[in-house]
From Swiss-Prot:
It holds the Pfam family Sybindin. The keyword Transport applies. Gene3D superfamilies: 3.30.450.70. CDD domains: TRAPPC1_MUM2. The gene is Trappc1. This is Trafficking protein particle complex subunit 1. SUPFAM superfamilies: SNARE-like. One of its GO terms (biological process) is vesicle coating. May play a role in vesicular transport from endoplasmic reticulum to Golgi. GO terms for cellular component: cytoplasm; endoplasmic reticulum; TRAPP complex; TRAPPII protein complex; TRAPPIII protein complex. It is found in: Golgi apparatus, cis-Golgi network; Endoplasmic reticulum.
């Protein structure tokens, strides 16, 4: 099992942070364009799920998968979206995404007066702690197999 990448978006679609670990294929477009496409897809899926679900879904959608990867999604009450792409063998990781938001983003970005909110995260401490945390996950593989 492995982690491919992670996105953090604000409620306006600004990509606050992007990290990559075992991404085998690049999108072939500029990163800014990739971020816009990812956010647009998330917005559309979220809207579709809320309209089509026969039940009142308090959490909306949590993940979806293709034949190649699984996208895990977590949205906070403030509209921050945490998105992690993994291989298909990874089960539900809502608690992992919540931890990334609450214990890393809030602690090292939101509570840091030197980190302006609504802009790309510049904190090296956040980046290094995020990288260490993701690498410590049981489904993170040192080899992209």
């Amino acid at each position: 099992m492995t982690v491919h990448n992670l996105y953090l978006f604000d409620r306006n679609g600004v990509c606050l942070h992007y990290s990559e670990w075992h991404r085998k294929k690049q999108a072939g477009i500029p990163k800014e364009e990739e971020y816009k496409l990812m956010y647009g897809m998330l917005f559309s899926i979220r809207s579709f799920v809320s309209k089509m679900s026969p039940l009142d879904m308090k959490d909306g959608f949590l993940s979806f998968q293709t034949s190649r990867y699984k996208l895990h999604y977590y949205e906070t009450p403030t509209g921050i979206k945490v998105v992690m792409n993994t291989d298909l063998g990874v089960g539900p990781i809502r608690d992992v995404l919540h931890h990334i938001y609450s214990a890393l983003y809030v602690e090292f970005v939101v509570k840091n007066p030197l980190c302006p909110l609504g802009q790309t995260v510049q904190s090296e401490l956040f980046r290094s702690r995020l990288d260490s945390y993701v690498r410590s996950l049981p489904f993170f593989s040192a080899r992209a197999g």
